[in-house]
């Protein structure tokens, strides 16, 4: 079975910001825009926003508009207004709209745009973000790309709108690597796959002949590390997405599990299972293939995840009796327990913002996804149920993705949830899905 490998090498497919802040596109603005979202104040009311169909010679403009609206709505911060309520029909997206028509339907912000095909076959995508109550333009940008990248253009535009109105980077122009699960429960086939963050453009990167688990992106998005049972014993592998080349990470005599990259992409941290049933944490330097042991205990130390600055590692250990969260220096120094609640903890992952650690918690017959400050204080459970597991952070540290299995028949599915715990959404995938890992923003 031939597997298509994704080319994630950074390419110049977009010519962005060509007209940003150009006099023909951007109006004079005060230092502070009237419309904005305070993303830091907890639960907020979604901002009503009107997103008009981008003008185009075919259905593409409407398709791009739908993706933008879906991205923004799924974040929980925006409430796209039904197009049936629109009063003004936009015929020239470059011209100032009739702001009164949009204020009548309480559109706090307005998006207009156009898609045109260039003589060289590329697409030109233009959009404008308007502050309707302030009566001014907030953004005017244009992008050039190939027709097959139209969905990515939509995600980039959604990111620009998100950032302008919240002050935070967006997370829509990203991918997720995960485990696709198909077939009956007794003969489940698990393949590694990559998709856009909204579930579109699924591509398989393994054939399912060997059980593969816990895939994780490298910081440059060009590699994936994962665990495979090829040969019968779990080992950690490194896969080059552009070429499909694969190599074993560390020639350890025992089983290696739970791999993850360091923030600079130069190391992989993982756990090595010992003959006595214990597991210790090691790193392998990808530059010279040297390995370093970080923990030495009779316990099971696993699930290591670096802080974004690379100075610390959070991991799970049962050295105190049951699995709890610990933090140590990146060299293995000064390990200290940070979780003090009831239950067992697993799959910790440090936020890209550096302020929180997400985890899975098992307590009182339920599996929960939660977050805690890096010193263990302020623990909050965001969602609980029969089986929730494996949180992964969006690159802006505002949203988590995880997998859930309901009681009874069936298999796991992917969900996202924000830090309020109120905005939970299922991500549609072709089959059952587990073990998601979010990529950094694409470039």
UniProtKB/Swiss-Prot annotation:
Signal peptide region: 1-33
Gene Ontology terms: biological process: cell division; protein import
Transmembrane segments: none
Highest taxon listed in the record's lineage: Bacteria
Intracellular or extracellular location(s): Periplasm
Any one Pfam family match given in the protein's UniProt record, by short name: PD40
Keywords, comma-separated and alphabetical: Cell cycle, Cell division, Periplasm, Signal
InterPro entries the record matches: 6-blade_b-propeller_TolB-like, PD40, Tol-Pal_TolB, TolB_N
Cellular compartments per GO CC: periplasmic space
Self-association and partners: The Tol-Pal system is composed of five core proteins: the inner membrane proteins TolA, TolQ and TolR, the periplasmic protein TolB and the outer membrane protein Pal. They form a network linking the inner and outer membranes and the peptidoglycan layer.
Family to which this protein belongs: Belongs to the TolB family.
PANTHER family registered for this protein in UniProt: PROTEIN TOLB, PROTEIN TOLB HOMOLOG
General function of this protein: Part of the Tol-Pal system, which plays a role in outer membrane invagination during cell division and is important for maintaining outer membrane integrity.
Protein name: Tol-Pal system protein TolB
Provenance organism: Brucella suis (strain ATCC 23445 / NCTC 10510)
Lineage: Bacteria, Pseudomonadati, Pseudomonadota, Alphaproteobacteria, Hyphomicrobiales
Gene: tolB
């Amino acid at each position: 079975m031939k597997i298509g490998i994704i080319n994630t090498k950074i390419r110049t497919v977009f010519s962005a910001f060509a007209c940003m802040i150009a006099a023909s596109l951007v109006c004079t603005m005060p230092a502070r825009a009237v419309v904005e979202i305070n993303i830091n104040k907890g639960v907020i009311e979604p901002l009503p926003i009107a997103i008009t169909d981008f003008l185009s010679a075919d259905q593409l403009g409407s398709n791009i508009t739908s993706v933008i609206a879906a991205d923004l709505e799924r974040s929980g911060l925006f409430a796209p207004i039904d197009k049936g309520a629109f009063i003004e029909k936009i015929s020239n997206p470059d011209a100032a709209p009739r702001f009164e028509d949009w204020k009548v339907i309480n559109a706090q912000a307005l998006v207009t745009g156009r898609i045109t095909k260039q003589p060289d076959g590329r697409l030109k995508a233009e959009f404008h973000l308007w502050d309707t109550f302030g009566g001014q333009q907030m953004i005017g940008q244009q992008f050039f790309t190939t027709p097959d990248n139209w969905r990515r253009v939509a995600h980039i535009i959604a990111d620009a709108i998100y950032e302008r109105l919240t002050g935070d980077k967006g997370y829509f122009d990203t991918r997720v690597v995960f485990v696709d699960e198909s077939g009956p429960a007794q003969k489940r086939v698990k393949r590694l796959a990559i998709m856009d963050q909204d579930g579109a453009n699924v591509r398989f990167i393994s054939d399912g002949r060997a059980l593969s688990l816990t895939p994780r992106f490298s910081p440059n998005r060009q590699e994936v590390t994962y665990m495979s049972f090829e040969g019968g014993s779990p080992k950690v592998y490194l896969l080059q997405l552009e070429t499909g080349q694969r190599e074993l990470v560390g020639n350890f005599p025992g089983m290696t599990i739970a791999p993850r990259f360091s923030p600079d992409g130069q190391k992989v941290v993982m756990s090595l299972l010992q003959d006595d049933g214990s597991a210790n944490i090691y790193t392998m330097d990808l530059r010279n293939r040297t390995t370093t042991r970080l923990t030495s205990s009779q316990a099971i130390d696993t699930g290591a995840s670096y802080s974004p600055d690379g100075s610390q590692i959070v991991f799970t250990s049962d050295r105190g009796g049951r699995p709890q969260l610990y933090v140590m220096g990146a060299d293995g120094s000064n390990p200290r327990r940070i979780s003090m609640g009831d239950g067992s903890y697993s799959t910790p992952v440090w936020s890209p913002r550096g302020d929180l650690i997400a985890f899975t918690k098992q307590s009182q017959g339920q599996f929960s996804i939660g977050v805690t400050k890096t010193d263990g204080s302020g623990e909050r459970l965001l969602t609980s149920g029969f089986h929730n597991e494996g949180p992964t952070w969006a690159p802006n540290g505002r949203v988590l993705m995880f997998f859930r299995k309901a009681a009874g028949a069936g298999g796991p599915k992917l969900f996202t949830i924000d830090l309020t715990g109120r905005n939970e959404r299922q991500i549609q995938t072709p089959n059952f899905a587990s073990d998601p890992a979010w990529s950094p923003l694409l470039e």
